[in-house]
Amino acid sequence: LKAIEKYLRTKLKLTINREKSGVKKPVQFTMLGFGFVPTYIKGDKGKYQLVVSEKAWKRLKISVKAITRKTKPMSFDERVAKINEVQRGWLNYFRGASIYGKLRDVDGWLRNRLRYCIWTDWKKPERKRKNLIRLGVDQDHAYAWSRTRKGGWAVAQSPIMLTTITLKRLKQRGYIAILDVYTELNPSVYEPPYTRTVRAFFFKKVVV
């Protein structure tokens, strides 16, 4: 390793990042937001699949939270358009990784963030009551929920919002589910992850 470092410094005039350089096991290695985990397939010992690092997942959530913050002066349609843009850009970069399972959790979380925006946009109790009735909630439940002391994020995850602000209604407002974007960009999503050409995709990303 020292010989390699010397060659990089003296011959190629490259700066070495000590934190990111070294001999590591694949599961300890992350680069450009990617990492590796074992395939966990019987008989496939020593094989790994490409995944997204935890830092990259956190960055995605931070971006979405910034867009859906109630203090952000944006209309609902503007928020939806911005989220669609962010998630498509993120998936374009990470589409070669095995992320379908984790995306299902993110998909539900994204919808709740939009429900949170809708609930906070309604602001006054009377407006909340009327809108809930328009969405099919009976008078008594609409009144009770419009006066609830629960916070906006708790209400966004409650049955009253899950059954009224459905995925179908969100799509009617222009929202594109992150799972739909992923399957569009990655038609091979239903193939076993260990059948994909991980090495070629990864090093193509590194070179580019």
Where are these regions (language model features)?
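Non-catalytic terminal/accessory segments
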Residues: 1-208
